[in-house]
Structures are given as C-alpha cells and as structure tokens.
Design a protein with these regions (language model features):
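Selected transmembrane alpha-helices and immediately adjacent juxtamembrane segments
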Residues: 1-34, 46, 50, 124-223, ...
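Short helix-loop boundary/capping segments at the starts of domains
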Residues: 24, 28-31, 40, 44-45, ...
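Interfacial helix-start motif at the membrane-water boundary
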Residues: 24-25, 63-68, 228
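Membrane-embedded helical hairpins/re-entrant loop segments and their flanking transmembrane helices
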Residues: 35-66, 207-213, 239-240
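Structural signal for the C-terminal ends of transmembrane alpha-helices
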Residues: 38-43, 202, 264-265
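Membrane-interfacial helix-loop connectors
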Residues: 69-128, 204-274, 278
Length: 300
C-alpha cells in the first residue's frame, strides 16, 4: 500500500473517480447484459412482430413511452437495444426507447422529484424534453434516413432455435449469452470511465462555471459537464439540483436531459455497435433538440 502514498494527489483523485464511476455503472451493465441474454433466448422475431404496432407513428410512440414500464439505466441500454435490433425490432422503435428509458422510468423520475425538493416541475420538464428528442429520432429513422444502424462488420450473435430446450437449459443459455455480453460491453465501459475520470480530474468544473455567463453558453457548458461526469441517470438529478443556483433552470434541465443520452461511456459503447453515421445523427439530434428546448424554457 506504500506505493499509493508516493502517487501524486491528482492520480489518486483520478483513481477514486474512476472506481466510483465503475462501481456506480457496473450493476446496471450487468443487469442490461442479463436482460439481453434472456431476450436472445426467450424472444423470437415472430413474437416481436406480433407485439409491435403496425403503424409507424404508433410504433415510434410505443418505443418512446415503453421505458416507463420497462426501465433501464443508460449504462446497460446499448446491449439491450442491440439485441432488440437483432430480433428485428425496427430502429424507429428501438432508438426512441434507448433515448427515453434511462429518463422516464419511475425510479429516475422519483429521484428527480426528490432531488429538487419534491417538485414535479423539473420532473415534467425532463420528461417532455426526453419525449421530444425520442419522437424526433423515431421520425427521422422511420421516414427520412436509413434505418439500418447496426455495424455491418460487427460481431453479431448467431441465430439459434432454443424452443426445443427445457426451461432450465434455456435459462442456462441466457446466462451464457449474458456473460459474453457483459465482458464485451464491460471493456468499453472501463475505457469510457477512465476517460471520464481523467477529464473530471484535469478539467476543473470551476473553469466551466466561470465561462457559462449567457444562456446559450450556460446550456452548452452543462451539456458538456453531463458528458464529462457520465453519471447514471438514477444519480444525476442530485448533482443537477446542486448546480441549479449557479446556472439556472434551463441549463440544469439540459444537464438532466443530455447526460443519460450522451455521455462518454455510453458514446463509446454505441460506437462499438452502431454505424458512425447513426451515432452522429443520434448525438447531433439529441444535442440540437436539447439546446432549442432549453432556450425556449429560458424565454418562457
């Protein structure tokens, strides 16, 4: 342990932040991987097609709102969405779910309500912002751009028929898939967490608060801060509430909306599974809509 006493304080801080991000995110990645494994084994493309609305607009709306009853943290959402896409869920349904599930689920909404002094105002603002972004992404994927978003050269799962296996063997196969998914996703989580910890350590937040004077700059700064901190959506409301007095309502809402959609660790995991063009579309759309929405909040 003596070696730690010889390390610079900044390195010790980096290690502490890195471990805190990993400890916070790892359970949700594990949960997402387990859910992904069970989707692989128990959900067939035929079941998916029977369950989804046939109308595109309704399918987009379904994907946007289903996160309320099917919660997931952004730390584990990418493997779940990847598996849904492999099961022939349309991207215009899956991606709205990816955008809103970490924000509109009851756990996060209640955490937001609690963090802001038992106020539904910020819960509503967060919900509406996430809803708008998800609907716009769904419309773009459903009617405007190419909806084939998975990488062509990615390592896709092989198609197997598990229907003939006993329940116990199917559960075992689901757990095998979950382990593979966990280690595949986990390495990108570790790298993303290390980058986030480095930026938190060597880019002091006081620099960001100093330059965030006007409304546009303040919104951009808070979005950048959310990207750097890479907090899980269950915890970010408490950080956002602590910044409310320094930045105001609109920038704080930008922090609450953009963080669960676009942070360092999530971006790296998306880049691993999705085409670069789609990742750019997702980040650009989410960021632009967040900025416009929060600017309108500032005017209103």
């Amino acid at each position: 342990m003596a070696i730690f006493h010889q390390l610079p304080d900044s390195v010790l801080q980096l290690l502490a932040v890195f471990l805190s991000i990993i400890i916070e995110a790892l359970p949700f990645v594990l949960l997402g991987s387990i859910l992904s494994g069970f989707i692989e084994v128990f959900v067939t493309p035929e079941k998916v097609q029977d369950f989804l609305p046939k109308n595109k607009v309704l399918a987009i709306l379904f994907g946007t709102l289903v996160g309320f009853i099917f919660p997931s943290c952004e730390c584990g959402i990418v493997p779940i969405i990847t598996r849904f896409l492999e099961k022939k869920v349309p991207s215009y349904t899956a991606i709205p779910f990816m955008a809103t599930a970490p924000i509109i689920n009851p756990v996060v909404l209640f955490a937001t309500y609690t963090a802001f002094g038992n106020s539904w105002y910020y819960v509503l603002l967060r919900f509406v912002g996430a809803f708008l972004i998800a609907m716009i992404l769904g419309i773009l994927l459903g009617f405007v751009v190419d909806d084939q978003i998975l990488k062509d050269n990615r390592k896709a799962s092989h198609v197997h028929d598990y229907s003939g296996l006993s329940a116990g063997k199917r559960v075992f196969q689901a757990l095998v898939h979950a382990v593979d998914e966990f280690f595949d996703t986990g390495r990108y989580l570790i790298f993303g967490s290390l980058v986030a910890a480095s930026m938190q350590t060597y880019l002091p937040t006081r620099i960001l608060t100093t330059i965030g004077h006007n409304s546009v700059t303040a919104i951009l700064i808070m979005m950048l801060l959310a990207f750097i901190l890479s907090l899980c959506s269950e915890a970010d409301a408490f950080i956002g509430a602590s910044l409310l007095s320094s930045f105001g309502v609109a920038p704080t809402v930008a922090f609450l909306i953009s963080g669960p959609m676009v942070d360092i660790k999530n971006l790296i995991m998306m880049k691993h599974q999705f085409k670069t063009r789609f990742v750019g579309l997702f980040v650009g759309t989410a960021s632009l809509v967040t900025i416009i929405y929060c600017l309108l909040l500032g005017v209103i």
